[in-house]
From Swiss-Prot:
Function text: Involved in the transposition of the insertion sequence.
Pfam family membership, one: DDE_Tnp_1
Domain of life: Bacteria
Keywords of this entry: DNA recombination, DNA-binding, Transposable element, Transposition
Name of protein: Transposase for insertion sequence element IS1106
InterPro entries in the cross-refs: Transpos_IS5, Transposase_11
GO biological process: DNA transposition
Length: 288
């Protein structure tokens, strides 16, 4: 209660209510002969409009986004799902991938400098969202962020990390592997293939499931090609999670500006996704 009082006390824009007015508003008694129905509805509506103020939720969300509170909340939800038997406690595999989240602002109308390979060479910054960056994906230029995600073998999101869209995947694998037990197999696409990442897996006693990437003048061997084909079949769970985020939760585009707020929204969406998977498991008919 002390933290809540301290938080609202500094919010000068929030409405200040006297104790007498608050008491009178909270006496929204059920409709009766002495309290007509329309009067009851009016009192209840005034009560909701005052206490369910968007400013309260906005400041509370921003407060949670300042540190790792939402990451800890995601871990807490996963731990509770494990205790209820809805999630595997120690999965033998971890699947890593990334998806693009477009910025909430309109795209900037300006030219984009690209190199000979079509990659963006100039650092163009949007006029509203200062943290978003451009990236070329499937032949299209997109402005936004990149969500690096780690799921277990069942598709439950365990950890995520948000960067500008132009950040390369291979440099952001170690933060996703924190907390993994030894012996876990890490599956990832060729975007995460690098000597540093393979060494990181070896040092932390994690099994290498990263697809190999062909280099210039050094194509993949037949064995590496077969290995990549096999590993690609094990990564569908994280791609299904991204598909659910985009379709059911409409998260192909962010709702806020800035890296911190987009990261907060991604964590909240991940919690909803995990709870949805658990609810679907509860409603599924028991196998004979």
């Amino acid at each position: 209660m002390a933290e809540y009082s301290g938080l609202t006390k500094t919010s000068s824009a929030l409405p200040r209510l006297s104790s007498k007015r608050t008491y009178s508003l909270m006496r929204a008694e059920a409709p009766s002969e002495s309290v007509p129905y329309y009067s009851y509805c009016l009192r209840l509506r005034r009560l909701v409009l005052i206490f369910v103020n968007p400013l309260y939720f906005m400041r509370y969300r921003n407060w949670l986004a300042q540190d790792d509170t939402l990451s800890e909340l995601l871990e807490l939800i996963n731990r509770q799902l494990t205790e209820k038997g809805l999630k595997v406690e120690k999965a033998s595999a971890a699947v890593v991938d990334a998806t693009i989240i477009q910025t909430a602002g309109s795209k900037q109308r300006q030219a984009i400098e690209v190199d000979e390979e079509g990659q963006i060479s100039g650092q163009t910054t949007p006029s509203k969202d200062k943290d978003a960056r451009w990236i070329k994906k499937n032949g299209l230029y997109k402005l936004g962020y990149k969500q690096h995600t780690r799921t277990d073998a069942e598709g439950y999101t365990e950890k995520l990390h948000i960067t500008p869209a132009n950040a390369h995947e291979c440099k952001h694998l170690p933060p996703l592997l924190e907390g993994l037990p030894k012996g876990t197999t890490v599956y990832a696409d060729k975007g995460y293939d690098s000597a540093e990442n393979r060494q990181h897996l070896k040092e932390h006693q994690l099994q290498d499931g990263i697809m190999r990437k062909a280099c210039r003048n050094r194509p993949l061997t037949e064995t590496q090609t077969k290995r990549n084909r096999y590993l690609s079949k094990t990564r569908y769970v994280v791609e299904q999670s991204f598909g659910t985020l985009h379709r059911k939760f409409r998260y192909a585009r962010a709702a806020y500006f800035g890296l911190i707020k987009v990261s907060a929204q991604s964590h909240l969406k991940a919690m909803c996704l995990n709870l949805l998977k658990a609810a679907n498991r509860l409603s599924a008919p028991a196998s004979a």
